[in-house]
Amino acid sequence: MPRRFDVIVIGGGHAGSEAAYASARLGARTCLVTHRRDTIGVMSCNPAIGGLGKGHLVREIDALGGLMGRCADAAGIQFRLLNRKKGPAVRGPRTQADRKLYRQAVQNVLFNHPQLEIIEGDVFDLNVENGTVKGVILADGQSLPSASVILTSGTFLRGLIHIGQTKIPAGRVGEAPSLGLSATLGRLGLRLGRLKTGTPARLDGRTIDWAQLEMQAADEQPVPFSFMTDRITNRQIECGITRTTAATHTIIRDNIHLSAMYSGQIEGVGPRYCPSIEDKISRFGDRDGHQVFLEPEGLDDHTVYPNGISTSLPESVQKEFMRTLPGLENVTILQSAYAIEYDHIDPRELSASLELKRLSGLYLAGQINGTTGYEEAAAQGLVAGLNAARTAGGQDVVHFSRAQSYIGVMIDDLISHGVTEPYRMFTSRAEFRLSLRADNADMRLTPIGIALGCIASDQEKRFKDYRHQIDDTINMLETRKLTPNEAAAVGIPVNQDGRRRTALELLAYPDISIADLSRLWPELDALDSKVAEAVEIHATYAVYMDRQNADIAATKRDEDRLIPKDFDYASLSGLSNELKQKLEKTRPENLSQAAKVEGMTPAAISLLIAFLNKGMLRHVG
């Protein structure tokens, strides 16, 4: 009798690790199937976590009890808060990470979870019965039954590495691709596409002349990702900065016909916001140089990652142009750069739970959905893991709104618009970024996590204490009032208009802090620094939030107006045949998604609302 699981996760990358951990936290009997146990949690490309938009996702994962934030804190060796001089809404926490420490941190959690079993193997096929996935079939013929399956294949689906004219079937360097699953997905009639990403060469740091380079230090006060991290204990390092030169550009231009991207050898589309050095030279040829960050990959590792210079040129050309960069005149390349193509599905095939609309029981997360980046993959893995476990347990799935989280923004973008290139998160993608800040991810999402049961007891207790302190402080500041003269007497300048202001109103002034107010109310001196910062940010944005809250409420109303799954759009009179076909193809779950269908007009939405209001939609039978 084969072992039976509630949830099987295919793949042990960032999406798979987060999915397996989320499922196991909910108590589901979870199995993670991966080619090699020792590669779970590996950082396949850049040795960094977070950044603009991406750091918000990591904070949200942590607020829901996930892995990535804690593991990044355990492995971080150069913490920097990006956009520090700008408003809190667009600040992005980031760290360079020690690859070995990060992998160990992920594995320490997963290997020791009682609800999680890890199996080494190659999933060759899915067991599908009557339109429902019932488990997986391994390449050795073994069948593993389960209630839900999560596919997190990364770049492994028909993965093909390109170095110049050389092609190597692989999911990443040294690991075989997954061929059977691509065939299965195609056989099931899913819309597949081809995308491309790339990674730069790895350099031997002992052969770099660091004395020539500008050095970038870590922040003096590291800002952790995880709510549960009190302080960063790793030694913090510097990274070097160099630039391409005219000689670099000449070599690349002279050999660009040998690039896999420019020879027509690659059919997949690459990420717009992480272009190869060939793209940079072709598209921005008038620049005198392009910045390259030399990022050490570990505290006891001499490998260096040259961020900003990915390529698919031949190895000989890579060596030639690399040595034209200042500081790299004698550099040794440890691993050549390469581009990799892989299959993905059209994410419009998915519901907001990340389950396939036409194949129940199968959830997808990560690069298979058309995204790029560790953080985007991990966030999807978390959602898929929670929903697969809840479905297996007979519970309703959970949806994350774009008004509630960057996770919701990303998923809504994917399932509403699909992708024509690898999708990357930016703060500019969110309409409600004043309220979707990295600093308040816990306040937005941890209560949801507590209700779902995916928050550990120590995190729940700490969060409730933290929220209680913030609420008490805000309430206190709302009850304390000052006249302009009283404020001026303690060095707090305000307009001399005679109006009494609350302490919270005063705190909204850009030059007034909790420390200033503590001259009047010394009890504020005792506030925890995180609580004080949270209260200051709350005061800063409070005046802007009324209008945004009204917009958020309108968005939520549209998201809450569900459209029956079996609605026959052909019967909806008043719409063009083209729009009916698009609605039939995308099958939006609610009004918010329907409004994003290409060609949808305000008149068409009004017609759909009228049908909903009049009860003319055919009910699910």
Swiss-Prot record:
Q: What is this protein called?
A: tRNA uridine 5-carboxymethylaminomethyl modification enzyme MnmG
Keywords in alphabetical order: Cytoplasm, FAD, Flavoprotein, NAD, tRNA processing
Q: Where does FAD bind?
A: 11-16, 123, 178, 367
Q: Which HAMAP family does this chain map to?
A: MnmG_GidA (MF_00129)
Query: Gene3D superfamilies per the record?
Result: FAD/NAD(P)-binding domain, GidA associated domain, C-terminal subdomain, tRNA uridine 5-carboxymethylaminomethyl modification enzyme MnmG/GidA
- Stored PROSITE patterns: GIDA_1 (PS01280), GIDA_2 (PS01281)
| Keyword Secreted appears in the UniProt entry | no
Family the entry assigns: Belongs to the MnmG family.
Q: Where in the cell is it found?
A: Cytoplasm
Q: Which InterPro entries match?
A: FAD/NAD-bd_sf, GIDA_C_N, MnmG, MnmG-rel, MnmG-rel_CS, MnmG_C, MnmG_C_subdom, MnmG_C_subdom_sf
| Described function | NAD-binding protein involved in the addition of a carboxymethylaminomethyl (cmnm) group at the wobble position (U34) of certain tRNAs, forming tRNA-cmnm(5)s(2)U34.
Q: Which Gene Ontology cellular component terms are annotated?
A: cytosol
Which residues bind NAD(+) per the record?
A: 270-284
The keyword Hydrolase is assigned to this record: no
Cofactor requirement: FAD
Pfam families according to UniProt: GIDA, GIDA_C_1st, SAM_GIDA_C
Description of how the protein assembles with itself and partners: Homodimer. Heterotetramer of two MnmE and two MnmG subunits.
Query: Which BP terms from GO are recorded?
Result: tRNA methylation; tRNA wobble uridine modification
Q: Which Gene Ontology molecular function entries are recorded, alphabetically?
A: flavin adenine dinucleotide binding
